């Protein structure tokens, strides 16, 4: 019964993820338009979403998300046999997937899922799901955020361009709640190594960093268990 319940929960999470991804660009276009109108109300243009500089990309059929997320939730519960811990871990992985997908396709990271990841990490520390205490989780999150924030501004000052995006330090804030400060060098090394490997294979001139940060979180967590 619980396996079926987790399959349904995963399916609902998949549907929610699909709608969030599918509506991300239209919502962003509308938000930019509304901000423009507020700044220049006397010069209100007619909004044409199809003429916007950034357009939505296909994100797959909603049924695939329902099935994929449902199976993921089910498999996690089958092996873990702990309802709350499974739910916490499954939602964490779902957030990482959404953040990675959006950054890979649009090179954009919304602070909203990153903040959800942050609070979810704190909740996990409070429930003793992670190796960190609540205070350690907070300290680590601030440290991760600070390091990425400094890297962002130093690279912008030194290279006159962004080596990291603004969304990356918001993502680092969320990731920091899952890893100790001691693991920061290993986490960065794995993320950079993954990025370099994919860069060599793909040959793309620019790669988003968030997918590698998310993968590095999973790998680093597995190594340090």
Language-model segments: what does each one mean?
Residues 1-225:
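A membrane-topology feature that recognizes alpha-helical transmembrane segments
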């Amino acid at each position: 019964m619980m396996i079926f319940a987790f399959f349904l929960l995963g399916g609902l999470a998949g549907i929610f993820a699909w709608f969030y991804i599918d509506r991300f660009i239209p919502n962003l276009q509308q938000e930019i338009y509304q901000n423009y109108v507020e700044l220049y109300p006397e010069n209100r243009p007619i909004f044409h979403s199809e003429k916007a500089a950034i357009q939505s990309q296909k994100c797959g059929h909603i049924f695939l998300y329902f099935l994929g997320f449902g199976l993921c939730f089910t498999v996690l519960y089958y092996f873990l046999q702990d309802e709350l811990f499974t739910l916490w871990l499954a939602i964490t992985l779902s957030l990482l997937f959404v953040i990675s997908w959006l950054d890979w396709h649009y090179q954009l990271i919304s602070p909203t899922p990153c903040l959800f990841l942050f609070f979810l990490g704190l909740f996990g520390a409070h429930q003793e799901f992670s190796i960190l205490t609540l205070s350690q989780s907070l300290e680590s999150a601030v440290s991760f955020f600070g390091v990425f924030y400094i890297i962002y501004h130093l690279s912008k000052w030194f290279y006159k361009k962004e080596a990291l995006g603004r969304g990356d330090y918001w993502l680092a804030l969320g990731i920091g709640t899952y890893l100790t400060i001691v693991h920061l060098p290993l986490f960065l090394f794995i993320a950079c190594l993954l990025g370099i490997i994919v860069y060599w294979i793909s040959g793309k001139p620019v790669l988003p960093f968030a997918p590698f940060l998310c993968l590095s979180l999973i790998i680093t967590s597995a190594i340090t268990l």
